[in-house]
Amino acid sequence: MKLTLNRILFSGLALSILFTLTGCVGRDAHGNPKGMIWEFLGKPMSYFIDYFANNAGLGYGLAIIIVTIIVRTLILPLGLYQSWKASYQSEKMTFLKPVFEPINKRIKQASSQEEKMAAQTELMAAQRAHGINPLGGIGCLPLLIQMPFFSAMYFAAQYTKGVSTSTFMGIDLGSRSLVLTAIIAALYFFQSWLSMMAVSEEQREQMKTMMYTMPIMMIFMSFSLPAGVGLYWLVGGFFSIIQQLITTYLLKPRLHKQIKEEYAKTPPKAYQSTSSRKDVTPSQNMEQANLPKKIKSNRNAGKQRKR
């Protein structure tokens, strides 16, 4: 159940990223980008790509890389904040495992659907009582703020005039590149592997599918788009690795120490359910309770007939 939910959430998130990148910026009748995101973000990015390519004489390939580095550096704090939230929830779950383990055991050993649902409800209540939100680590707001920048840069790399007719290190930026696609896939696979190293063995088993989902998605997108856009994904892969390294070796150790000190002062207590277990056979009890009344009523009816 939990593994299936994680797969659904991650697959939905991956598809949302793809649709958002193509949906934040609209197109006119001629297929050119338009809309508020393009006007306020995409056009300035396209201008700087053109500036670095022509005025600075760096070429369009290097220009895309430089502008992508600038954009990703500006929004890196949002990505780190998102990682911090997810890591905080993960670390708390690790420390609170002894509290939730008995309830999880009851869920696995439930003999009926009603018993399983009751245990799941109790688990959710216990998580709320200890400040755990299963979806709290996703960090929707930082992700939503980043999406317009991703989308604008995506379209700037694709539609800036001159990109499609240029080359970079022997790669035609207007055509698909198998070499670039392979490098991008390797980068995102390495980033996924790094993220697996930062979690417990149990969580690692649950995240195996997610480890391959992102690289496969990046292969699909990189190979179906021109190499100019692939350079954008390439730089994004390096930044994803940088963000993951900061999360794994800086954020998580600090959070682990912080939460350990918090629970050392106030150790977590086992959750006490406030609701009592209900009788699963209320109809039988009611029938037994009403039985004497029925008998008494029948006796009175017999006396009346004798009279």
Curated annotation (Swiss-Prot):
The keyword DNA damage does not apply. GO terms for molecular function: membrane insertase activity. Residues 271-288 have a biased composition (Polar residues). It is a multi-pass membrane protein. A lipid is attached at residue 24 (N-palmitoyl cysteine). GO terms for biological process: protein insertion into membrane; protein transport. It comes from the Bacteria. InterPro entries: YidC/ALB3/OXA1/COX18, YidC/Oxa/ALB_C, YidC/YidC1/YidC2_Firmicutes, YidC_ALB_C. Residues 293-307 have a biased composition (Basic residues). Residues 263-307 are annotated as: Disordered. CDD domains: 5TM_YidC_Alb3. Residues 1-23 form the signal peptide. It is found in: Cell membrane. Required for the insertion and/or proper folding and/or complex formation of integral membrane proteins into the membrane. Involved in integration of membrane proteins that insert both dependently and independently of the Sec translocase complex, as well as at least some lipoproteins. NCBIfam families: PRK02463.1, yidC_oxa1_cterm. This is Membrane protein insertase YidC 2. It comes from Streptococcus pyogenes serotype M6 (strain ATCC BAA-946 / MGAS10394).
